[in-house]
UniProtKB/Swiss-Prot annotation:
Its main location: periplasm. Keywords: Iron, Metal-binding, Periplasm, Signal, Transport. This is Metal-binding protein YtgA. It holds the Pfam family ZnuA. GO terms for cellular component: periplasmic space. GO terms for molecular function: metal ion binding. InterPro entries: AdhesinB, Bact_metal-bind_prot9, Lipoprotein_PsaA-like, ZnuA-like. The gene is ytgA. The keyword Iron applies. The keyword Nucleotide-binding does not apply. Monomer. It comes from the Bacteria. Belongs to the bacterial solute-binding protein 9 family. It comes from Chlamydia pneumoniae (Chlamydophila pneumoniae). Fe(2+) binds at H73, H139, H205, D297.
Amino acid sequence: MDAKMGYIFKVMRWIFCFVACGITFGCTNSGFQNANSRPCILSMNRMIHDCVERVVGNRLATAVLIKGSLDPHAYEMVKGDKDKIAGSAVIFCNGLGLEHTLSLRKHLENNPNSVKLGERLIARGAFVPLEEDGICDPHIWMDLSIWKEAVIEITEVLIEKFPEWSAEFKANSEELVCEMSILDSWAKQCLSTIPENLRYLVSGHNAFSYFTRRYLATPEEVASGAWRSRCISPEGLSPEAQISVRDIMAVVDYINEHDVSVVFPEDTLNQDALKKIVSSLKKSHLVRLAQKPLYSDNVDDNYFSTFKHNVCLITEELGGVALECQR
């Protein structure tokens, strides 16, 4: 009898531990839940996630789907992603074709909880979208004057979903937008110290058009469209595309035409194309790779510090002065 009772107690102890773990770490069918059973807000990437965190504070749980150095252009869902999407109260996507793989589209399109920030911004005329060969450029986080508008969209969605915390979300959002405005002005000041004849950006792939239009071009160039001559890359909007000899030669000609002395590799991209370009120019033109890589489709520590990194690196490598940032 004692042995039987001991067995029963042992089984009950295991059941208790299992249930406790489920409460603490589980994801129920009705949504992500943590120890406090807070609804979860899922962001597709860190550029969105870092803004969402600032807006919600500690009122809601937050999570990010595409982490680390993974390429958002080519991301295919892995085990557990389906549950994360199904269990989230709101899913913030960049939109504009960034989340275009079949597995992501299957679970995001027609999902009532999915919010495409880029499309919402275009619908209310918040910015002028850029295109390449008829494809919309999704890299809007590169321009803080656009991305702070995304914060406003995020806030409006969250207030509609959770009106009980509207005052707190609005206050957090206003503080963040103010900080982003200061950071935007700082970036313009830094990059304006680069001599105008040196403001030419050669990067790994075409992720810096919004950045160039906002921070490297003159007002006259923005108005006329001539700002496009301020940047080039061997790869297109997505790093998935194959690079041709013609693409490489176009960059070589650009470097010679504008007397470019430094080209910028990107953290997540293979540097072979840029190395070939530098190598092919060795005898006729002195050009080198920047000492550090730029971040385009991912972040280093967080979105805001990564933006500062890119601004400082481009400014200093192109002959400008990186001013002290107050934020």
